[in-house]
From Swiss-Prot:
Belongs to the DadA oxidoreductase family. It catalyses: a D-alpha-amino acid + A + H2O = a 2-oxocarboxylate + AH2 + NH4(+). It holds the Pfam family DAO. This is D-amino acid dehydrogenase. Pathway: Amino-acid degradation; D-alanine degradation; NH(3) and pyruvate from D-alanine: step 1/1. FAD binds at residues 3-17. The lineage of its organism: Bacteria, Pseudomonadati, Pseudomonadota, Alphaproteobacteria, Rhodobacterales. Its cofactor is FAD. It comes from Cereibacter sphaeroides (strain ATCC 17029 / ATH 2.4.9). InterPro entries: DadA, FAD-dep_OxRdtase, FAD/NAD-bd_sf.
Length: 436
C-alpha cells in the first residue's frame, strides 16, 4: 500500500520504518526541516516501562491544589478560555479513581514493556548508537510518605512480572554513587533493573536515515493542511506543497493531531502538556548519575547521556505556549544541583521546552478510526520515547491485518467513542473544513 505518515518525531519515524519493513511504500510529511525537531528533540531520555504511569491518579486533585502554592511545583495549570482544556481536565478527574488508575497503568506498562523489546530488536538489527545505557532507573523518594505510597505501583509491577528492587538510602547510593552528598535527603528508592536510557533525538535521526536508505521518502518543510476524503474514505493529504495520495494515512502529529481529524467528526482527546529540560555538560563524571534518577518530589528525571546530563520534567497545562519561563529553568537546575551538585556546568546548560500529547488516561491512541483509511498513532504524553517502537509495531500489524503480539483492543480510539457514534456511516464526514 501507499501510506503517508504525518509527523517525523520518534513515533512517526518508527511507524514509517516498521511499515516500510513490512513492504509498504511510505512517505513521511513534516513541517520541520529534519526529523525529531519538536517534542522528540530534548526529552528526559528515559526508556522506563516500569514507570509508565498515568498522571491521573488517586490523590492528584488534592496535590494539584497544594502545588499551586509551591515555588517548584511539578504541575502548573494555566486556565484558558479553551473548551478542549476544560474537557481534558474533567476527563483527568474522572480517571483519578483507584480502579481507573490500576487499569490505565496496567495497560501502559503492557505497551511499554513490549516497546522495550521492540527497541532491543531495532538496536540489534540496525546497530544504531544513541548514547544508550542498560543500567536500570531509580525512582528517588525524599520522604517515608512517598516510599509508602509506592506500594500501589509495586503491586502493579509485581502483577506484570516487572523486575524491581525496593531500596533504602544506602541501596540508592550503591546504585547511584553520585548521590552520596545528598544522603541525608533520601528516604529510599524504587529501582527498575530492566529500564534503559538513551538520546531520543539521536535515535530518531539515525532511524530516519536508515528508513530513507530503505526507500521511505521524507518531505520536510511541508505543512499539513487537511485530509483528503472521497466516498467516505481518506485518500490522501493536502499540504503546503501539494497533495499526497495514499491508500492509508497515519496521523502521528502529537498535540496537533486533534485539529487535523476534527473536521472528520472525530474528537480525539489529546491535549498539549508542556514539559521542560536542560542539557548540562558533565564536568565531574564521578558526581554524575549512572543512569536515570527520577526525583519523585518534583517529578523531574535526571539522566546521563554520554558526556551530558539531561534534566527534564514538570507538567504545565497552558495550551500551545512555547515560552521558556526562567522559573522553570530554575526548578530543573535546583533539582540536579541538589542531588548531583558539581557534576555538571549549569552555566552552559541549554534550555528547551516541548509539548507532550497527553490523553486523560495516559495511554496513547494507536489503531484504526471509524474513517476508512485513517489510522492513529498519537497521544503518548511523557512516554513517546518509551512507547514508540512498540506502538509502531502494533500499528504495522493492525494495518496488515495481523494480530499484534500484545493485547491491543484497548489502545484504539474506540475507548473514547460512544457505541452509537461508532456505528455512524462515513458519509457523514465533512472533508472540506480546514484542519489547522
Amino acid at each position: 500500500m501507499r501510506i503517508v505518515v504525518l509527523g517525523a518525531g520518534v513515533v512517526g519515524v518508527t511507524s514509517a520504518y516498521e511499515l516500510a519493513r513490512a513492504g509498504h511504500e511510505v512517505t513521511v510529511v513534516d513541517r520541520q526541516p529534519a526529523a525529531a525537531l519538536e517534542t522528540s528533540f530534548a526529552n528526559a531520555g528515559e526508556i522506563s516501562p516500569g514507570y509508565a504511569s498515568p498522571w491521573a491518579a488517586p490523590g492528584i486533585p488534592a496535590k494539584a491544589l497544594r502545588w499551586m502554592f509551591m515555588k517548584h511545583a511539578p504541575l502548573v495549570i494555566r486556565p484558558r478560555l479553551d473548551a478542549a482544556q476544560v474537557r481534558f481536565l474533567l476527563a483527568i478527574l474522572r480517571n483519578c479513581t483507584p480502579a481507573a488508575y490500576a487499569q490505565n497503568k496496567g495497560r501502559m506498562v503492557r505497551l511499554a514493556e513490549y516497546s522495550r523489546d521492540c527497541l532491543t530488536d531495532l538496536r540489534a538489527t540496525t546497530g544504531l548508537a544513541f548514547d544508550e545505557r542498560q543500567q536500570g532507573t531509580l525512582q528517588l523518594f525524599r520522604s517515608q510518605k512517598q516510599l509508602d505510597a509506592a506500594a500501589r505501583d509495586i503491586e502493579v509491577l509485581r502483577a506484570g512480572g516487572v523486575p524491581f528492587e525496593l531500596l533504602d538510602a544506602d541501596g540508592c547510593l550503591a546504585a547511584e554513587p553520585g548521590l552520596r552528598a545528598a544522603r541525608d535527603r533520601i528516604a529510599g528508592g524504587l529501582r527498575l533493573t530492566g529500564d534503559e536510557t538513551g538520546d531520543c533525538f539521536k535515535f530518531t535521526q539515525g532511524l530516519a536515515g536508515l528508513a530513507e536508505e530503505g526507500g521511505v521518502r521524507f518531505r520536510y518543510g511541508t505543512g499539513v493542511e487537511r485530509l483528503r476524503v472521497e466516498g467516505g474514505r481518506v485518500t490522501g493529504v493536502e499540504t503546503t506543497k501539494g497533495t499526497f495520495l495514499a491508500d492509508a494515512v497515519v496521523v502521528a502529529l502529537g498535540s496537533y493531531s486533534p485539529a487535523l481529524v476534527a473536521p472528520l467528526g472525530l474528537r480525539l482527546p489529546v491535549y498539549p502538556v508542556k514539559g521542560y529540560s536542560i542539557t548540562v555538560p558533565i564536568v565531574d563524571a564521578e558526581r554524575a548519575p549512572v543512569s536515570t534518577v527520577m526525583d519523585e518530589t518534583y517529578k523531574i528525571a535526571i539522566t546521563r547521556l554520554g558526556t551530558r546530563i539531561r534534566v527534564g520534567g514538570m507538567a504545565e497545562v497552558a495550551g500551545f505556549s512555547a515560552t521558556l519561563p526562567p522559573a522553570r529553568r530554575e526548578t530543573l537546575a535546583m533539582s540536579v544541583n541538589d542531588l548531583f551538585g558539581g557534576a555538571g556546568d549549569l552555566s552552559r546548560a541549554s534550555f528547551w521546552t516541548g509539548l507532550r500529547p497527553m490523553t486523560p488516561d495516559g495511554t496513547p491512541v494507536v489503531g484504526r478510526t471509524p474513517v476508512a483509511g485513517l489510522w492513529l498513532n498519537t497521544g503518548h504524553g511523557t512516554l513517546g520515547w518509551t512507547m514508540a517502537a512498540g506502538s509502531a509495531r502494533v500499528l504495522s500489524d493492525l494495518i496488515d491485518g495481523r494480530a499484534p503480539e500484545i493485547e491491543s483492543a484497548d489502545l484504539g480510539i474506540e475507548r473514547y467513542v460512544a457505541p452509537d457514534r461508532r456505528a455512524r456511516p462515513a458519509v457523514r464526514l465533512n472533508p472540506a473544513r480546514q484542519a489547522g
